């Protein structure tokens, strides 16, 4: 089974509104601070985090003990202007785990499976068409992947540039996902007991495809 941690910043909207209309520069600085705390605290315990609304944060946490998760969340609390709550979900897929958050399901935790995906030749496309063109292509890829994840049971996030990260239920799930993506892509897929190690392996696979100037998928176990 896969394990997901869902973190919520309680009262975040009310806090932002309390700052008055000249507030966005403050909000952005605080969001950056929380984002940094999220990544440093959760990767330190082997989990793979991301934000998908700045008042909600998520982490793939297969095989990460509960007390380590408590420690990671405590570090986020120290960076947050509001109370921080979290729940843990377990499921046969990462998406199932997210949807069951707080239901106290139990089971043997599987290896984490993570994909690191990018669009081929985006550097040249950016040089010719400009960065907004590449950014919109990346968002199209993410939107397509997110739709496919409803069927596959995965969760996809934008990483920046032309990259996305995907929490996968199993390695072969990447093929069902990429079948729907129109742009030529490379995907490294990492498999490991701990999610951040799986992501590191996925990046190694992606780097190998780039070095060989190949498209497709490379799985690293």
Swiss-Prot record:
Coiled coil: none annotated. Its EC number is 3.5.4.29. GO terms for biological process: biosynthetic process. It holds the Pfam family GCH_III. The keyword Nucleotide-binding applies. InterPro entries: GTP_CycHdrlase_3, Nucleotide_cyclase. GO terms for molecular function: GTP binding; GTP cyclohydrolase IIa activity. It catalyses: GTP + 3 H2O = 2-amino-5-formylamino-6-(5-phospho-D-ribosylamino)pyrimidin-4(3H)-one + 2 phosphate + 2 H(+). Keywords: GTP-binding, Hydrolase, Nucleotide-binding. The keyword Hydrolase applies. Catalyzes the formation of 2-amino-5-formylamino-6-ribofuranosylamino-4(3H)-pyrimidinone ribonucleotide monophosphate and inorganic phosphate from GTP. Also has an independent pyrophosphate phosphohydrolase activity. Belongs to the archaeal-type GTP cyclohydrolase family. This is GTP cyclohydrolase III. It comes from Pyrobaculum arsenaticum (strain DSM 13514 / JCM 11321 / PZ6).
């Amino acid at each position: 089974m896969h394990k997901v941690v869902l973190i919520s910043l309680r009262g975040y909207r009310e806090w932002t509104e309390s700052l008055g209309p000249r507030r966005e520069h403050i909000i952005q600085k605080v969001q950056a601070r929380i984002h940094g705390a999220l990544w440093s605290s959760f990767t330190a315990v082997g989990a793979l985090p991301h934000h998908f609304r700045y008042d909600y944060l998520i982490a793939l946490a297969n095989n990460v003990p509960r007390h380590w998760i408590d420690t990671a969340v405590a570090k986020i609390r120290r960076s947050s202007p509001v109370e921080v709550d979290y729940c843990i979900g377990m499921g046969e897929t990462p998406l199932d785990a997210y949807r069951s958050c707080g239901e106290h399901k139990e089971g043997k935790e599987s290896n984490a499976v993570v994909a690191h995906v990018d669009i081929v030749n985006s550097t040249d496309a950016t040089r010719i068409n400009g960065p907004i063109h590449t950014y919109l292509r990346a968002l199209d890829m993410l939107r397509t992947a997110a739709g496919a994840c409803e069927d596959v049971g995965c969760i996809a996030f934008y990483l920046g540039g032309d990259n996305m990260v995907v929490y996968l239920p199993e390695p072969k799930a990447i093929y069902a996902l990429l079948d729907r993506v129109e742009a030529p892509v490379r995907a490294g897929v990492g498999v490991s007991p701990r999610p951040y190690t799986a992501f590191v392996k996925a990046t190694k696979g992606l780097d190998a495809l780039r070095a060989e100037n190949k498209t497709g998928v490379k799985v690293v176990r």
